[in-house]
From Swiss-Prot:
GO MF terms, alphabetically ordered: N-acetyldiaminopimelate deacetylase activity
Keyword Hydrolase: yes
EC number per UniProt: 3.5.1.47
Protein name, as recorded: N-acetyldiaminopimelate deacetylase
Family annotation (CDD domains): M20_Acy1_YkuR-like
Length: 376
């Protein structure tokens, strides 16, 4: 039987950035091959650093998918744990070591007997930086194994162990990276009339763009436009010719995201025109679409967990954080949910350390749900 705590600790020590998860993939394949030995209804494929494990059903009517992400973050771990990261500047600070361990535990239980329906376990790379789910889908990695329904979870530090939270609509926002560069004309601070100050134009844009959400988004809906980087100039008495802004757009529906993206671009171009200068606008959403749960499947999952002993189900509001599972759920109906890990530190914090007792709880809950779906 798989030692869940040791497996998690092994994986925690080898975090790798997206599409560089070579040690992680090798570790996972070793475990998977041991679990599947002698199981003639199992097939395994790899895609770059990802892994797909397919359980052929005995009388399949559909394919049920379970997705887990496998990459780490470029963070220096500060937990002080004896099993802390052995990769300098890399850490499993988003709980993907927990995600992988729970998936392996569920795979072990699913292998106890051949399921009626097909089951697909996806170990997906590059959730954090490259939208690995989109890359796999667009590259045809699923082939005829593409699920009819897709499920997945994400750990959440502010929920207690034993709590599961989701809803019947949007769980995560869609996110879009924004880069804007204003190009004016530099000059001496004493002669502003001979220059065209990109810093002033960019500052004007920062204030004007605040109206995009307040005057274009229904107050009942949600959207965010935030610029966290503003770079302009090199010294106090020189008017800069360029100003660079780097920010993010977040929205709870894809239609709203596209509207906000369009308005941000329009405002930037309008400001540039008003100041008679050039502007470059780069919008990069990629595969980070809103994670929109299928209402009927979400209600089924919520009802199932609500009746499970030891589980407290929470109907939760959407989060404005992003998750690339949204891309796969735009192609396949499915559900994502939060799993409580009771950590005082947030996701992506260098001291984030979940409670390990959640591993057994997560495996028991998820595997029972997957067995139910596989038997339908």
């Amino acid at each position: 039987m798989l030692d869940l705590i040791q497996t998690r600790r092994d994986l925690h020590q080898i975090p790798e950035i997206g599409l560089e998860e070579f040690k992680t993939q090798a570790y996972l394949l070793d475990v998977i091959e041991k679990l599947t030995t002698g199981k003639d209804f199992v097939q395994i494929r790899t895609w770059r650093t990802g892994i797909l494990v397919y359980l052929q059903g005995s009388q399949p009517e559909r394919t049920i998918g379970w997705r887990t992400d496998i990459d780490g973050l470029p963070i220096v771990e500060q937990t002080g744990l004896p099993f802390a990261s052995q990769h300098q500047g890399r850490m499993h600070a988003c709980g993907h070591d927990f995600h992988m361990t729970i998936a392996l535990g569920c795979l072990e239980r699913a292998l106890e007997e051949q399921p009626k329906n097909n089951l697909l376990f996806l170990f997906q790379p590059a959730e954090e930086n490259e939208a690995g789910g989109m890359l796999m889908y667009e590259d045809g990695a699923f082939g005829d194994w593409l699920p009819n329904q897709f499920y997945g979870l994400h750990v959440r530090p502010d929920l207690k162990v034993g709590q599961i939270a989701t809803n019947t609509h949007t769980l995560f926002a869609g996110t879009c990276e924004v880069k804007i560069r204003f190009k004016g004309k530099g000059g001496h601070a004493a002669f502003p009339h001979e220059a065209n100050d990109a810093l002033v134009a960019a500052s004007y844009f920062v204030t004007q763009v605040q109206s995009v959400v307040s005057r274009n988004v229904n107050p009942i809906e949600g959207a965010v436009v935030t610029f966290g980087v503003f770079q302009a100039g090199t010294t106090n008495n020189v008017i800069t010719d360029t100003a660079f802004l780097h920010g993010t757009i977040r929205a709870l529906t894809q239609d709203m995201s596209l509207l906000v993206q369009k308005r941000v671009k329009t405002v930037a171009e309008g400001v540039a025109a008003a100041f008679d200068m050039e502007v470059e606008v780069e919008l990069k959403q990629g595969g980070y679409l809103p994670v929109e749960n299928n209402p009927a499947l979400a209600r089924e999952l919520m009802d199932f967990f609500d009746e499970k002993d030891g589980i407290e189900l929470i109907d939760i509001e959407p989060a404005m954080t992003g998750e690339d599972f949204g891309y796969l759920l735009s192609k396949v109906d499915g559900v994502m949910f939060w799993l409580g890990i009771d950590s005082p530190y947030a996701l992506h914090h260098p001291q984030m350390s979940p409670k390990e007792e959640v591993l057994a709880i997560g495996v028991a809950a998820v595997s029972s749900f997957l067995k139910k779906k596989a038997a339908e």
